[in-house]
Amino acid sequence: NCIQNGGKIMLFGNGGSAADCQHLATELTIRYKADRPTIAAIALTTDTSALTAGGNDIGFDNIFARQVEALGKPGDLAIGISTSGNSENVIRGLKQARDIGAAAAGFCGKGGGPMADVAAPYLVVPSNTTSRIQEMHITLGHMLCGALEIELGLV
């Protein structure tokens, strides 16, 4: 309902998960499998000025929460990606999403970690190997893109 109601998808994570966020936001905004109308999505991992100023001025643990506070609105969807489920900045970003009335979802691995307490739905890749978890996150993200295109009647 997020997209159908004029909302957007905000994705965030660290390291390889940040790259996954950027990849998936691009698949949604530009195209996945076919030319179609855009799906509003943004990776909160792309603005180096916001990330470095935030890390310096308000602490790295708060960088995604602050961006969600500024850019999010009720009805949006925040997707946090963490291979461990333990990334405090991702957890705080998801909490902030819930606080503003947005939905909070998560992709993780390694048993899930505390992200499970703030994200629903919450997809846990049953592996302790970071590279396998990241590969599955991209696969899950591609499945999400395809499902959205079909559900929204865009392809």
Language model features with spans:
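Glycine-rich phosphate/diphosphate-binding loops that line cofactor/substrate pockets in enzymes
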Residues: N1-I9
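Glycine-rich phosphate-binding loops that contact phosphosugars or nucleotide phosphates
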Residues: F12, S17-L154
